[in-house]
Amino acid sequence: MQFHLKSILLYLTVVLLPISCTSKKSDKEQNQYDWNTGSVVIVADSNLSYVLEQLIPIYENFYPAAEVSFKYTSEDIAISDFKNKRNTIIAIEKSLTADEIAVAAHNQDAKILENTFAYDAIAVIANKSFKDSVFVVENTVSYLTTATAAKLVFDNSKSGIARAIMQLSKTDPSVFKNAYSLNSVSDVLKYVSNNANAIGFIPYNLLSNRNEKEAQAIRANFKFLSVSYRDTITAISQESIAQQQYPLVRPISIYIGNCPDLAGQGFTNFLFKQQISKALLLSGLVPKNIPAREVNVTDEFNPEKTK
């Protein structure tokens, strides 16, 4: 009887041990491939810093085992490095072309995942004493080639904003070199503030949140020009961006290549959640997925209104 009992125990040990090991291995594999653990550094367009930084604590509050940070640079550098696998995940305000995606996919040796989660825009600003109230996209060349007093001012020579205006207006790069290129958006604000004939181009996200002091200051101290494109004049607002009526709308996207940091995919997935969409709406921007019963976009841009 004792021998029989020992035989049974030995049998159970032999049978159950592999099952136990398999279970432990599965748990380990599950943790290893948990998208919401670990850390990731995402290379991003510096003009997106205000948008992106406010999203980190929301995500990390839900997933405390994950850590997200951003390394900011110009849009041109971020894209160039992504195409050449010097980085593997980027956040930019641009839709990559089919050729850009193909080059990146080849060099990254991976399928490129495009994730557009929100929309921003380019705001056109001027000094309070500037006489005109409309910026005509098709007249960009005349601003750069004639003796007009107006000067176009951008944040830097590798700015995505400058490239967007150049491409939409179909201005030759050799002519566009006549535009003023400074070092940052802050420099653009200073220059326009001190020069009555300057026209500046800045991210809408800097002034979209009426509850932020910096946004309030920008709204109060600058003139905002409506934009004319193809004979249609549109003022910038959350609503005109949401309805894609404003001609200078820019998609905010994260592109993922051969990125080994799974938290990058976890964070990107979270950007489509209701919590992020609500935060973007409250900051005056437009999420790609607007939460049901939460549609409350501003139908008119009033720089003087701060609340």
Language-model features: locations:
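Central regulatory/effector-binding core of bacterial HTH transcription factors
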Residues: 65-80
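Short, conserved beta-strand segments within well-ordered enzyme catalytic domains
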Residues: 43, 69, 88-91
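Short beta-strand and adjacent tight-turn residues that come in two discontinuous sequence segments
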Residues: 73, 91-100, 183, 201-204, ...
